[in-house]
Amino acid sequence: MSQISMFVRKLHKFSYNPNYKFKCGLEIHTQLKTKYKLFSLSPTSYNEPPNTKLSYFDVGLPGTQPLLNPEALLLALKASVALNCDIQSYSSFDRKHYFYADQPLGYQITQHYYPLAKNGYVQLNKFDDMPDKVISLEQVQLEQDTGKTVNYDDRINVDLNRANTPLIEVVTKPDFENIDQVQAFVRKYQLLVSHLDICTGDLETGAIRVDANISVNNNPRVEIKNLGSSGEIVDALKYEYNRQVTLLQNNGKIIQETRGWNGIATESLRKKENAVDYRYVPDSELPVIRLDKNIQAQLQNTLDELPDSVLDRLTKEPYNLQLAHARNLLFQPEILDYYENIFGRIRDANKWFFHELLAAFAKSDVEFQVDIVLPDMLVDIVSSVEKNEISLTGARIILKHIIRNKSTKTLPQLIKELDIGKPEASAELEEAINEICQQIINTNADVVEKIARGHTNALQVLIGQAMKATKGKVHAKEFRSKFMELLK
């Protein structure tokens, strides 16, 4: 059996060896949601035809100079504050020299000597399904992305649309003691930057790319580059931990290197470079960034409510949501806004929102959209049920009709059109209810027999048929009462 096959088998039954301590740090590259690129006026582009969104500076044309995008700086500062970092009053840009086809300048503009922010932290906690754990951050730096190389027809093609896209690189300390903590941190980070509209938060599209530095028993660290999904992160770390443990058990030596993940195994890419190899020098074409000493407090006051705070609020009085429901709302800000709009305006808002409204969208196979069933419409529907103007079944019929037909009619118009208004109480109505119930009893002898044997849940079958026969005009409790009377 090859070494790779052996390691792959171990992935499926992974466990930590208590004699070999797992230690990991992350470098997270995050594309900022700006209109323009970091140092040019080219629009940021992710889905356009190759090499169509470029400026002379993006392609490294001699004589062109960089111009800092203030929107990118603001988003980087927002992220730094949200990550509990210390904003630096003085920061600057440096050139990181290396040659590769997707980097036309021959260097990357980054912040090596004086980064934008330092000394942050992220708190893992119950909202991440984790014990309390603080992950410390080294720094946050603003830098430019590279282009992309694409292998096609035995050629390497270069697409520079992504070149000079603004990034922040978040560097953690090696505080991760297991892979579950890594997963929880990445999920939390994704949620944070997407919630604050700093980044889309997508791993799969490359908006967030993760490099992991892993070591065992404080041996030299190995960097795994460009992990593009949660699954890749987990599998690559499991594989690399097993590889290093096996090497040490066989008296091998861990070398500091950069490795890639090919979907099955990590593979060596190059010996790990150090700062000298990159020949960092200050970028003389970009001025230093000097920030007011009050910038940290000012930014803190402008930030939206952070995810942990939202989850804490939603799981307490008066909302009392389950954590799973609160998370779902947090991941979908439009739905959260809708929920908070109707909460307090109707009784039992959680039942109506989750079990009636969202269920109606799901059953209709339609993605939730605020403008299909407006908050005021839902409030009116609930009010009509509470006033006994329509039944619960009638409300469900109306919701499904609006969703499936994108109806913009008023509630009274829908009640009339669908003929689901509750009939006026009268002797004739009582007689009609009695006749319907008796007819259903006569045609469902097997169900009646189950009820007689004590299977009271079977009564719902009869009630459901009665509700269907009356198109939901009569409340289920009235049918329940009549069936129980007739079946005594």
Curated annotation (Swiss-Prot):
Allows the formation of correctly charged Gln-tRNA(Gln) through the transamidation of misacylated Glu-tRNA(Gln) in the mitochondria. The reaction takes place in the presence of glutamine and ATP through an activated gamma-phospho-Glu-tRNA(Gln). It holds the Pfam family GatB_Yqey. One of its GO terms (biological process) is mitochondrial translation. PROSITE patterns: GATB (PS01234). Belongs to the GatB/GatE family. GatB subfamily. Keywords: ATP-binding, Ligase, Mitochondrion, Nucleotide-binding, Protein biosynthesis. It is found in: Mitochondrion. InterPro entries: Asn/Gln-tRNA_amidoTrfase_suB/E, Asn/Gln-tRNA_Trfase_suB/E_cat, Asn/Gln_amidotransferase, Asn/Gln_tRNA_amidoTrase-B-like, GatB, GatB_Yqey_C_2, Gln-tRNA_amidoTrfase_suB_CS, Gln_synth/guanido_kin_cat_dom. It is an enzyme of class 6 (ligase). It comes from Candida albicans (strain SC5314 / ATCC MYA-2876) (Yeast). The keyword Nucleotide-binding applies. This is Glutamyl-tRNA(Gln) amidotransferase subunit B, mitochondrial. Subunit of the heterotrimeric GatFAB amidotransferase (AdT) complex, composed of A, B and F subunits.
